[in-house]
Amino acid sequence: MAARRKPAVLTGFAPIGDSRATLLILGSMPGAASLAAHQYYAHPRNAFWPMLEAVWGIPAALDYATRVRAVVAARIAIWDVLASCQRASSLDADIEHGSIVVNDFEGFFRRHPQISMIAFNGSTAQLLYRRHVMPSLPTELRQIPALRMPSTSPAHAALSLQRKVQRWRELRRAVPAAST
């Protein structure tokens, strides 16, 4: 019987956003399609870019570099909780917990002092942040308001795109400075 091979270590991306960002949207870890394309939310069935179009008016049909510039102009930052991990598939459930390395959030918040809201793109991002990031943050950084939003992943199709957009619009109203 052959020994089961451990999945390769996957490494995420640098954050999108500049020091003017007021909203941080956090995922867990890029999926296989995103890693292959070197783009956040690259899976064609992920609703992230259509949601941003519906809520912030950033056209999903734009090329990736133009969308990124529009996100930055809207004072939005995009990142993931995990810097690296081992995962056998694109599913969050397949993340090997002993392999988790989180991003440097204290450094990120120091470089992005206007962040006034964190939006978790799904429950796994929220759980990973609470479990692996919050305990190491200074008190003032633990107090940044945070909301769990419906995941835009195609693996989470319990809500329609219309309902997801409705929830994300509620977030936009809570962070009025994050606008185009």
Question: Over which residues does each language-model region extend?
Answer:
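Hydrophobic packing residues within well-ordered alpha-helices of enzyme cores
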Residues: L52, L128-Y129
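A general structural motif
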Residues: R20-A21, Q114-I115, Q143
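Internal catalytic-core helix/loop-beta-alpha segment
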Residues: A73-L128
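Short, solvent-exposed loop/turn segments at secondary-structure junctions
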Residues: P30-A33, A47, A83-R87, S123-L127, ...
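C-terminal capping/extension of enzyme domains
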Residues: M1-D18, H43-P44, L91-N103, R130-T180
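Short, surface-exposed acidic-centric catalytic microdomains
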Residues: A33-E96
